Every structure is written in C-alpha cells, then in structure tokens.
Amino acid sequence: MSAAGEEDKKPAGGEGGGAHINLKVKGQDGNEVFFRIKRSTQLKKLMNAYCDRQSVDMNAIAFLFDGRRLRGEQTPDELEMEDGDEIDAMLHQTGGCLPA
C-alpha cells in the first residue's frame, strides 16, 4: 500500500495541471496497489513502479483501462480518468491453441 493519504491535498486549479489523482492497479490475483500521481504524469511511471513492486518484468504485463490497453506515454488527463479509477494488470499469455 502506498502512503497516498500522507501528502497534503492541493486545491485543483481546474482540470489537469498539478492536480493529483488516486488510481488503483488490480492484478489478476486480486492484489490491489494504490498510486497517487499528477494528472499530467505519463502512465509509464506508474507502470514501472507497479512492476518493481510486484517483481515482474514490464513486458510481461498488459495494463488495461476500461478494456483498452494503456500505452506508457498516455496520461490520466488524456484518458479522462477520475479519482479512484481502476487499472487492470494482466499477465501476457502466449499460445492457447490446441492441436487438432
């Protein structure tokens, strides 16, 4: 768990800018990790932090928001994320085809 509640909340000067957003990343195992980032911060920062915390390679995880895969250069503002939104972290699977 992060120390999201310890930071002073700054007044939001409109949408975006320096405003922070609280996001939840939920793994396939049900484990939830909370992050507090600026709305203008690229999501790759959150993705790297999640992978480091879970000891997983960044290329082994697909991050999804509303069923769409996230790219590292996207920001919460671009995706119109709201405080408390959930990002799904899914392990890549290869194969899935059975021999005939």
Curated annotation (Swiss-Prot):
| Primary localisation category | nucleus
Q: What molecular functions are annotated in GO for this chain? A: protein tag activity; ubiquitin-like protein ligase binding
Q: Where is the Ubiquitin-like domain?
A: 19-96
What are the subcellular locations of this protein? Nucleus; Cytoplasm
Q: What does this protein do?
A: Ubiquitin-like protein which can be covalently attached to target lysines as a monomer. Does not seem to be involved in protein degradation and may function as an antagonist of ubiquitin in the degradation process.
> In terms of domain of life, where is this protein from?
Eukaryota
Q: Share what the entry says about its subunit structure, partners included.
A: Interacts with SAE2, SCE1 and SIZ1. Covalently attached to a number of proteins.
- What is the protein name stated in its UniProt record? Small ubiquitin-related modifier 1
From the record, give the cysteines joined by S-S bonds: none
One GO location term (cellular component) = cytoplasm
Q: Which PANTHER family match?
A: SMALL UBIQUITIN-RELATED MODIFIER
Answer yes or no on keyword Nucleus.
yes
Query: What Pfam families does the record tag this protein with?
Result: Rad60-SLD
PROSITE patterns referenced in this protein's UniProt entry, alphabetically: UBIQUITIN_2
Which family is it part of? Belongs to the ubiquitin family. SUMO subfamily.
GO BP annotations listed? protein sumoylation
What Gene3D superfamilies does this protein's entry cite?
Phosphatidylinositol 3-kinase Catalytic Subunit, Chain A, domain 1
**UniProt cross-link Glycyl lysine isopeptide (Gly-Lys) (interchain with K-? in acceptor proteins), position:** 96
Where is the stretch described as Disordered? 1-23
CDD domains tied to this protein: Ubl_Smt3_like
Biased region (Basic and acidic residues) positions are 1-12
Keyword annotations of the record: Cytoplasm, Isopeptide bond, Nucleus, Ubl conjugation pathway
